[in-house]
């Protein structure tokens, strides 16, 4: 309708005016800029779509999709992560759309992604897992077991990793002997998706892993 069209045109005009005003108002006020980015990320982490929209609205005024994209993608994978991987992928897609259309229309796909992240369950299990592995490496860097190496030396055929026995792969020990029992990944039970991952993880932990590849390779095919 004509009325709806007029409303839409006014919305576009308002967004353009906000961008124009902002380029002067916030010109290179770096402290305010990074404080606003921080407010956005903390609002997403704290599941507050209203706070997130407020800080996003302020950031629109900088007309800087790239910096905004970096911060929101970090937030998606750092704070939502395995609790809702699809939301992370939708965030990537939203910013692809945003770059295609540019501001002021870019505000719509980005707002959708931010609200999605705000109201998603949260999990920092991936970040915690890689940080635990990095901490272990800082203490001692260990080589991969011989049977995992690209060209294993001094192993009989039956002692080598068997590419033709996929049913055995989850029984193999992949960590070096010195840290064989380390568990870097600890599931967060905040979503059905990660609960399903955790259930499979428990099943694998229950049957354990072995570095005796020769014995494993001699087990009968199921």
Task: Indicate where each model-derived feature is located.
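Alpha-helical, coiled-coil/dimerization segments enriched in small aliphatic residues
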Residues: 79-222
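Short, small-residue-biased leader/transition segments that mark boundaries at the very start
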Residues: 1-8
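Short, charge-rich amphipathic alpha-helical segments embedded
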Residues: 58-74, 81-82
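Short alpha-helical scaffolding segments that buttress acidic/His motifs in well-ordered protein cores
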Residues: 18-19, 39-40, 56, 69-76, ...
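Conserved helicase/translocase motor-coupling segment
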Residues: 22-58
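Short helix-adjacent coil turns
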Residues: 44-51, 60-63, 102-105, 189
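Extended hydrophobic
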Residues: 15-23
């Amino acid at each position: 309708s004509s009325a709806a069209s007029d409303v839409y045109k006014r919305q576009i005009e308002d967004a353009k005016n906000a961008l124009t005003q902002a380029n002067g108002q916030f010109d290179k006020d770096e402290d305010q800029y990074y404080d606003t980015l921080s407010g956005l990320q903390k609002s997403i982490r704290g599941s507050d779509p209203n706070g997130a929209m407020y800080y996003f609205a302020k950031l629109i005024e900088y007309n800087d999709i790239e910096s905004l994209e970096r911060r929101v993608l970090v937030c998606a994978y750092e704070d939502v992560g395995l609790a809702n991987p699809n939301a992370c992928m939708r965030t990537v897609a939203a910013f692809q759309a945003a770059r295609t259309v540019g501001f002021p229309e870019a505000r719509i796909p980005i707002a959708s992604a931010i609200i999605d992240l705000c109201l998603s369950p949260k999990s920092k299990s991936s970040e915690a897992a890689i940080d635990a592995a990095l901490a272990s490496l800082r203490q001692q860097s260990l080589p991969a077991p011989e049977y995992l190496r690209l060209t294993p030396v001094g192993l009989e055929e039956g002692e080598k990793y068997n590419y033709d026995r996929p049913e055995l792969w989850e029984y193999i020990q992949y960590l070096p002997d010195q840290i064989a029992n380390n568990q870097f990944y600890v599931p967060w039970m905040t979503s059905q998706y990660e609960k399903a991952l955790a259930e499979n993880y428990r099943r694998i932990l229950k049957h354990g892993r072995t570095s005796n590849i020769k014995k494993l390779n001699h087990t009968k095919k199921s």
